[in-house]
Regions:
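A residue-level detector for the "anchor" residue at the start of short, highly conserved motifs
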Residues: 2, 6-221
Length: 221
């Protein structure tokens, strides 16, 4: 155990496995909801002055305001720097985009030398392939829906939804073609449903056929 103290810094690792969500409170009072398949790391030196966390996956944050100490979320795409606010960050390594939705307060996106300040109601998306960042205004409350056990998206493709459902329910969902995956729609469900009920609801919304064998689900037109 003495080896632990010889190193400069150790990290606490907080994980939500596939099929589960977790909630935690950090030492500064900040509350974090971690979505399925996500990992949050922070230094054992995390305190009132050093407020930095590393996120792989998706988390919804309610950050305690500290006048002189910024709170930083580091992701694979950019850093989100805040004072005190409510926001959602999604940065799964397997996804092609990194997104931030700001519900309340102010955050700043840092990518290399680039700085972008966000205001409530804004949604920022980084395309990891091109490096392009886009900013839009939409109903950002949908981005915290998962932390309240709801599935709610105003405009989502089947491919995007399937990636989220696979993590949330710990299943393998395959799409027959890119064409099926490109279908766009709006969906609003209570997240208490089983994956079977979610698939049944999807078939009501868009013209698809779903086959299921245990954890494997196949979707075609």
């Amino acid at each position: 155990a003495s080896d632990v103290y010889k190193r400069q810094e150790d990290y606490f690792v907080f994980e939500a496995p596939y099929g589960e969500k977790s909630k935690m409170t950090l030492a500064d009072g900040t509350v974090v909801w971690l979505n399925a398949g996500s990992i949050l790391k922070y230094s054992d030196k995390f305190n009132e002055r050093n407020r930095k966390v590393i996120l792989s996956g998706e988390a919804y944050f309610e950050v305690t305001k500290k006048e002189k100490a910024e709170f930083t979320v580091q992701t694979c795409g950019y850093d989100v720097v805040v004072k005190g606010t409510k926001f959602d960050v999604s940065a799964y390594p397997e996804d092609s985009v990194v997104t931030t939705a700001l519900i309340e307060g102010v955050v700043e996106i840092h990518r290399g030398e680039q700085r972008m300040e966000m205001i409530p109601g804004e949604f920022v998306k980084l395309d990891m392939a091109t490096g392009k960042i886009t900013r839009t205004r939409n109903d950002v409350k949908q981005w915290k829906a998962w932390s309240e056990n709801r599935i709610e998206f105003e405009d989502i493709t089947l491919k995007e939804l399937v990636a989220k459902l696979s993590r949330q329910y710990d299943v393998n969902i395959s799409l027959e073609s890119e064409q099926v995956g490109a279908k766009r729609f709006r969906i609003s469900l209570r997240n208490r449903e089983t994956i079977g009920e979610v698939m049944a609801a999807l078939q009501e919304i868009i013209p698809i056929t779903v086959e299921r064998r245990g954890k494997d689900i196949y979707i075609r037109e």
